[in-house]
A protein has these predicted regions:
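PAPS-dependent sulfotransferases, especially Golgi type II membrane carbohydrate sulfotransferases
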Residues: 1-8, 182-185, 206-210, 215-217, ...
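Catalytic beta-strand/loop signature of glycosyltransferases that borders the donor
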Residues: 33-36, 247-249
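PAPS-dependent sulfotransferase catalytic domain
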Residues: 103-248, 266
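A polyampholytic, Gly/Pro-enriched intrinsically disordered region
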Residues: 52-62, 188-197, 267-274
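PAPS-dependent sulfation machinery
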Residues: 35-144
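A conserved segment at the C-terminal end of the G1
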Residues: 18-30
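P-loop (Walker A) phosphate-binding loop of NTP-binding proteins
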Residues: 11-12
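Catalytic donor-sugar/metal-binding loop of nucleotide-sugar-dependent glycosyltransferases
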Residues: 28-32, 166-167
Length: 303
């Protein structure tokens, strides 16, 4: 069996990663992860932490566990059997890895990781991901795609684990992202906090991607893909993945991703005080520009 190509899509969150996964999985050569966000790779005490050590932003508790790999692995195992296995997502639906593999397959993955991580941690982590993809039914498909939003902020570490991985960075106008996240029960409720939430993630993504080869990264604007440059961006996505166009995928793009679905600039209708959101966004955007981080703002800036 040939080795599947792993694709990791991500972004700030609320930026179109799920939209991308649903489009790609209509192609006969692509299988989407089940669930669309596996979580066990980039979450705290996840596979990256077990195989590479905790990242710079890891919680203190995970740093303490990492002093002993057996303790960190035990926490990984507990979470793989718990919150990553079955959880209620933001839509109130049950999600988790149980949708893609059996408990017996999960335990096989854990046993093999525990056996091999002390010998070659990177190879152990890579093998875990590849075997997970195969267990989820990967057969004739060339690609397996996961769309956990933190993937891009951890792209440098994922690249160390899987050097052949490809990354699709989904971006969206910060004000629409802010409005979207402010309407989530788990999100920041005021514009300043939402602007910080967005800009922090843009900085993390930018820094991580500087450590990844440029030809392994595609940055896609949700607005350009769905609204303003549909044909060009659709073609660019296919070319990046070296995929031939297929009728089912093109039909899905035309019928399920019409331009009116995205409505750039609709943030003004979804917030209580658009002027306050604009001010908070503008201050955050200026900070990003000072750091050399692209904002991917949709449309011309105000005069």
């Amino acid at each position: 069996m040939s080795t599947p190509q792993l694709i990791f899509s991500g972004g700030s969150g609320r930026s179109g990663t799920t939209v991308l996964a649903k489009l790609l999985r209509t192609h006969p050569q692509v299988r989407a992860s089940r669930p669309l966000e596996i979580r066990c790779l980039t979450d705290s005490a996840g596979l990256l932490d077990v195989c590479l050590g905790p990242g710079a932003d890891a919680p203190l508790g995970v740093r303490a566990l990492a002093r002993s790999r057996p303790l960190l692995f035990a926490e990984f195992r507990r979470r793989l059997r718990g919150r990553w296995w079955e959880r209620t997502n933001r839509l109130g639906k049950v999600s988790g890895l149980h949708r893609g593999i059996t408990p017996e397959q999960r335990e096989t993955l854990l046993r093999e990781l525990q056996r091999s991580v002390g010998q070659d941690a990177r190879e152990a982590g890579r093998s875990f991901l590849l075997e997970l993809a195969r267990m989820q039914g990967l057969d004739a498909e060339r690609y397996w795609v996961d769309t956990s939003p933190p993937n891009i902020a951890h792209a440098d570490r994922i690249h160390r684990l899987v050097p052949q991985a490809l990354f699709v960075h989904m971006v969206r106008d910060g004000r629409d992202t802010m409005a979207s996240v402010m309407n989530e029960s788990w999100g920041p409720s005021d514009p300043e906090a939402a602007a910080t939430w967005w800009s922090d993630r843009m900085v993390a993504a930018h820094r991580a991607l500087t450590e990844v080869p440029a030809d392994a990264v595609l940055t896609l604007s949700l607005e350009s893909l769905v609204v303003t440059e549909r044909a060009e961006e659709y073609r660019r996505l296919l070319e990046f993945l070296d995929l031939p166009d297929r009728p089912r995928m093109r039909r899905y793009f035309a019928e399920q991703m019409p331009a009116e679905r995205v409505r750039p600039g609709s943030w003004r209708e979804r917030v209580a005080d658009p002027d306050q959101v604009e001010r908070a966004y503008r201050a955050a955007a200026q900070r990003l520009e000072a750091l050399g981080v692209p904002t991917h703002e949709f449309g011309p800036p105000p005069p």
